[in-house]
Amino acid sequence: MTAANVPGSSIGVDALPIRENLRGKSAYGAPQLTVPVQLNTNENPHPPTKALVDDVAESVREAARELHRYPDRDAVALRTDLAAYLVRQTGVPVTVDNVWAANGSNEILQQLLQAFGGPGRSAMGFVPSYSMHPIIADGTETEWLPIFRRADFALDVDAATAAIAERRPDVVFVTSPNNPTGHSVGIAELRRVLDSAPGIVIVDEAYAEFSDAPSALTLIDEYPSKLVVSRTMSKAFAFAGGRLGYLAAAPAFIEALLLVRLPYHLSVVTQAAARAALRHANETLGSVHALAAERVRVSKALEDTGFHVIPSDANFILFGEFTDSARAWQAYLDRGVLIRDVGIPGYLRATVGLASENDAFIVASDEIAATELTSSGDRG
């Protein structure tokens, strides 16, 4: 069916009475292309084990017996399992009352801005960082206040605290490890941000399992009215298709989110599948060590080729410098390798994949390094 044959296709978004703050904005969209090597969305490349697949299938089969009923609207059993995982992973004695879950960490962040942002309120982030933060701010009519990082992409805590003191944001986002640069933020630095913030601080720990840095969860009891730590099962847990995000905070934050969450937002199927995935956490997270080793190997290969590699604590690598990032991205795609142009001039981001995928990426990088698309190639 052509566009001309689609009912209503004679108008575009601009013809709709859309909110003014959304006009001219672009939707989130990482390219989804079928190519031999896909290293653009920071997924765990290791597929689930047979034991996990079987457990998910059986759990969903059992849950299907109750599909005619609404699910547990508070997902108590799932939140209990998530709390137990966090205790094992971080050593912080959180309970079910400290944990909330939703359909991916983006829904968690959206609920937080619905409750603590909104018209007349502001959210601050340190860019470049996760591209969904400003999109969620726009969607909730929360003013977005971007503060630039240092030239090496690390968080400038002095500049951050000064900006917080000047702008007085209601919400502050700190991403650790930061996407797309890979830096982690230390506990001492987080304390400075928390001490300076007049409102809440959301520490986005989507990639925490890949980092050796202590989790911000250790600060929840110290900053109960300010700190929220968001996490996801999409990355290290290899559960991107399951769409499960969660947070840990003082119980009062969960009470606040109950005011804005949609009823029965987590399906019985999602809850059952996520609980099954958590039962296999040890096997799944075993791949984290393999990916960390591959991250070191790929980083060294890129550096040996002449690229500038930003140190990373996550499962991705930001590297450059390219004379034209968009053309360099296309050059990788032409070689069957899909990576990500994250909008940082001169740099691209590649997910750490399986060894064979990384080998293909390294070969493509060697070829591209010899062209006019890189600073070193241009000098040659």
UniProtKB/Swiss-Prot annotation:
Disulfide bonds: none annotated. Pathway: Amino-acid biosynthesis; L-histidine biosynthesis; L-histidine from 5-phospho-alpha-D-ribose 1-diphosphate: step 7/9. Its EC number is 2.6.1.9. GO terms for molecular function: histidinol-phosphate transaminase activity; pyridoxal phosphate binding. It holds the Pfam family Aminotran_1_2. One of its GO terms (biological process) is L-histidine biosynthetic process. Its cofactor is pyridoxal 5'-phosphate. The modification N6-(pyridoxal phosphate)lysine is found at residue 235. Keywords: Amino-acid biosynthesis, Aminotransferase, Histidine biosynthesis, Pyridoxal phosphate, Transferase. It catalyses: L-histidinol phosphate + 2-oxoglutarate = 3-(imidazol-4-yl)-2-oxopropyl phosphate + L-glutamate. InterPro entries: Aminotrans_II_pyridoxalP_BS, Aminotransferase_I/II_large, HisP_aminotrans, PyrdxlP-dep_Trfase, PyrdxlP-dep_Trfase_major, PyrdxlP-dep_Trfase_small. Homodimer. HAMAP family: HisC_aminotrans_2. Belongs to the class-II pyridoxal-phosphate-dependent aminotransferase family. Histidinol-phosphate aminotransferase subfamily. This is Histidinol-phosphate aminotransferase. It comes from Rhodococcus opacus (strain B4).
